[in-house]
């Protein structure tokens, strides 16, 4: 695995986590 795909996968994980966090916050957990 090269550094570019590693960076992209890390970015997708952070994006998905923040999106889920926003949804949870909007629903009041």
Swiss-Prot record:
GO molecular function terms attached to this record: electron transporter, transferring electrons within cytochrome b6/f complex of photosystem II activity
Q: What is its main location?
A: plastid
Give me the Gene Ontology terms describing cellular component.
Answer: chloroplast thylakoid membrane; cytochrome b6f complex
Keywords (alphabetical) are: Chloroplast, Electron transport, Membrane, Photosynthesis, Plastid, Thylakoid, Transmembrane, Transmembrane helix, Transport
Membrane-spanning ranges: 3-23
Keyword Transport present in the record's keywords: the answer is: yes
Q: A GO biological process this protein is involved in? A: photosynthesis
Q: Name one Pfam family in it.
A: PetN
Membrane topology type, per the record? Single-pass membrane protein
Does Signal appear among the keywords? no
Localization annotation: Plastid, Chloroplast thylakoid membrane
> Which family does the UniProt entry place this protein in?
Belongs to the PetN family.
* Quaternary state and interactors: The 4 large subunits of the cytochrome b6-f complex are cytochrome b6, subunit IV (17 kDa polypeptide, PetD), cytochrome f and the Rieske protein, while the 4 small subunits are PetG, PetL, PetM and PetN. The complex functions as a dimer.
Q: What does this protein do?
A: Component of the cytochrome b6-f complex, which mediates electron transfer between photosystem II (PSII) and photosystem I (PSI), cyclic electron flow around PSI, and state transitions.
Name of the protein in question: Cytochrome b6-f complex subunit 8
Q: What is the lineage of its organism?
A: Eukaryota, Cryptophyceae, Pyrenomonadales, Geminigeraceae, Guillardia
């Amino acid at each position: 695995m090269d550094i570019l795909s590693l960076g992209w996968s890390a970015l997708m994980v952070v994006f998905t986590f923040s999106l889920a966090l926003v949804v949870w916050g909007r629903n009041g957990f």
